[in-house]
Amino acid sequence: MDRWVLGFALAVSVVTSVVFGWAPALHASAKASEPLKKSGRGLTGAEEGTRLRSTLVVAEVAMSLILLAAAGLTLQSFVHLVGSNLGFNPDQVLTMRVLPPSSRYKTDEQGIAFSRQALSGIRSLPGVQAAGTVTFLPLSGWWGVRSVSLQGKSVPEDQRPIAPWNSVTPDYFRAMQIPLIKGRFFEERDDERAAPVAIIGQSLAKRLVPNADPLGKWLDVGGLKKPAEVVGVVGDVYQLGPTSQTIAGIYLPFSQVTAPILCFAIRTTEDPSGVAKAAQEAIWAVDKDQAVGFVMNMSQLASEAVAPQRILMQVLGLFGGMALLMAVIGVYGVIASSVAQRTNEIGVRMALGARSGDVLRLVMREGLALVLLGVAVGLAGILGLMRFVSSVLYGVRPTDPVTMVGAAFALAGSALLACYLPARRASRIDPMVALRYE
């Protein structure tokens, strides 16, 4: 999230809260300290002041509702994101990345030998269940594409559909727990001497052969001299996170299609951090000069993938809470001011037989009218503004009725509680004291 945008939003929210919340409350306090000193001559001015404060409170309630609804939507969105299926299991997976220098690994055979020896050493470590390598690790922010089409279709390569690709070793799918839909995973026999093979994701399979079995089909893949046979279909993996439409499409065996990047995925039976040092030493046992970087748990990457949504949720939650507090203060201030101005009227009503409950309901109705008007304006504002936040939501509609109703009830309930204090005070006024009140 851009820090300037965040700072600007914070400043606007604070200023808005102060203007719409504290201003009415402070004004009400001033009025309460010298009530109706100018009961005759100042009547028009008092009425204008009341209308202004009421208008400000209605605006505050409306803006508070919009912020509360936005906070509720982002909270639901974040919950959906955290629980979303990435296409693999990030728990208990250690990752690290190496870039074998071309000065020492001049041929494909040398790169293949390095990966096999390093993986063999890592798999022998206590607590390691499976280990494999991949070119572009999911959620790392790195990805690449290749053109891909069914063999026999006369489509120029620059016009073929493109799909994210990865070069992987056989145990990669087991290490990441990517589900096999049909066919098989890569095996050691799928080496540089064997016929080219490929595994494709479920979505790509539906695109290429929507009404047929993709197994056994041959694909023309960009960069490959020969067609590759589809030997397996796996579940979709969200390469850049659940909010992205970038889904891993085609997997090629590292033994047949090498790459200058090797990202290790190591599934462990215990805390992955506990085997990090030993895994690095297993790589250095093959090449003591090989730099090893990007050492972290896959669950940490998964957490970072939803970090922008987490920050947005926290910011809007903070702003929503501040706005709710200011709305409550504003409503309290206006009702307290109204009670102070109407002390004589209340005394007359009670002298003529009005009961405490009647006065309580009278004052509460005044507060309820302001709150309901603010809620109505806020709901109208939500319908007009929420479509602009749809791009940052996941798994929830911008106009989710449960969120709207929940925010409205939370705001209305809090505001009515703020009305109750001055209303109760008004219901306990002594009529004789109120009639002498000037």
Kindly label every feature range from the protein language model:
Residues 323, 344-390, 406, 410, ...:
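Transmembrane alpha-helical interface segments in multi-pass membrane proteins
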Residues 30-43, 329-370, 428-436:
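Intracellular coupling helices
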Residues 74, 113-308, 314:
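Mid-to-C-terminal secondary-structure elements
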Residues 1-105, 393, 432-438:
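Alpha-helical transmembrane segments of integral membrane proteins
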Residues 1-11, 41-57, 147, 256-261, ...:
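Membrane-helix entry/capping segments
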